[in-house]
């Protein structure tokens, strides 16, 4: 028994290396099988396609306004992003990512910050400079009532006065005196009459068939020709010179009636309105009156104004109704027209109210004449005058004015060509803007002497041209 056990142990010991070898081989086979299966599984697994590389860089996308860091998942689920954003905001765990800035944007922001800094510094320096004490050469009317000193109140008032004066260049007329000084008394008209152009002498309208057309009011030529013997007529247009100059030339081509032309450029701009300020005309306001269709245009000197209804382009005789009053006004020895104009109730209907007054005076005058004619004493003193009633004084003035108008128009018709040449020869000004700026303007007497000298030179030149024309006519 013991022998059998020993023999089996010996046999087992001899077979032990073989068994160990078989076990090692089986383990190797199993390992190779597992590794091969894993490799096969990995090879059979589909590969994800790689995203294509774009030729657009992040800088280019940022310049175009595209957020390069935003993925497709963010675009697919905007609701989830909003929910997540609110959660993060409430918890304070996260912050929004700043968009990436390009180098150009960074430089642009830097230059903008520098610009803001220099601008604020310049504005502050300008404000301090404008609130300084008054200089000796600053106008007296600008610093009127404001003293020097560096208290906050005085500095603010000086700053405001200087700041407001910057805009007077655009609000005031181009010159303080729009007209030259009036001629000496022998050559001066007693009164100055300022007249509008638009909707008083002319009316412009646009139609689809004809476009823009301008109509001249009936009686315009007679109105200007008749009153030019009494008044210095100034035509003050409410449009700019570039639009109205040609119309004025058509209205008075030889400049026989209108003395001066003014336009919208010469108005005062105040409270959003262009105002015709008579104080800039270099004329006595007591001897100046203006007719206009817009009350806002004469609001600074309403006591000098006669308001007219705008003309709508239809034929009327409204211009002729102004002549009796204007003729009466200029033929009376008055020093100020404003009290007479203020005596009328309505400035829109002065011609009608004046006509009523004249009729009352005429009736009273005729009654007095009849009473005088019926008395025997007047018949004995002057029998010839008793049979001929006296004329109303205003009728005598009108008859004399008509005679002068006829003579004047006849002279213009005869001398039309001469007047055109004279206008071209004497259109040169007697002084320049440099003379006005330097204060070297000639006196009215000196200007009249210059005009007379030009007139003399023109007469000599015209006589020579006339003789040449006569010789050429005889030669033919």
From Swiss-Prot:
Q: Pfam families annotated for this entry? A: NIF
Assembly and interactions? Component of the TIM23 complex, at least composed of TIM23, TIM17, TIM50 and TIM21. Interacts with preproteins in transit.
Q: How does it sit in the membrane?
A: Single-pass membrane protein
Where are the membrane-spanning stretches? 111-130
Which region ranges are annotated with the description Disordered? 40-103, 435-455
What are the Basic and acidic residues biased-composition ranges? Answer: 40-50, 66-85
Can you provide one Gene Ontology molecular function annotated for this UniProt record?
Answer: mitochondrion targeting sequence binding
* Membrane side Mitochondrial matrix: residue ranges: 10-110
Q: Which UniProt keywords apply?
A: Membrane, Mitochondrion, Mitochondrion inner membrane, Protein transport, Transit peptide, Translocation, Transmembrane, Transmembrane helix, Transport
Provide the family line: Belongs to the TIM50 family.
Q: What is this protein called?
A: Mitochondrial import inner membrane translocase subunit TIM50
Topological domain ranges for the Mitochondrial intermembrane compartment: 131-476
Q: What are the GO cellular component annotations?
A: TIM23 mitochondrial import inner membrane translocase complex
Q: Please name the GO terms of the biological process aspect recorded for this protein, alphabetically.
A: protein import into mitochondrial matrix; regulation of mitochondrial membrane permeability
Instruction: Please report the organism this UniProt entry assigns to the protein.
Output: Eremothecium gossypii (strain ATCC 10895 / CBS 109.51 / FGSC 9923 / NRRL Y-1056) (Yeast)
Q: Where in the cell is it found?
A: Mitochondrion inner membrane
Does Iron count among this protein's keywords?
A: no
Q: Give the InterPro entries listed for this entry.
A: FCP1_dom, HAD-like_sf, HAD_sf, TIM50
SMART domains, A to Z: CPDc (SM00577)
Outline where the chain's transit peptide begins and ends.
1-9
Q: What does this protein do?
A: Essential component of the TIM23 complex, a complex that mediates the translocation of transit peptide-containing proteins across the mitochondrial inner membrane. Required to direct preproteins in transit and direct them to the channel protein TIM23, and possibly facilitates transfer of the translocating proteins from the TOM complex to the TIM23 complex.
The chain positions of domain FCP1 homology read 186-329
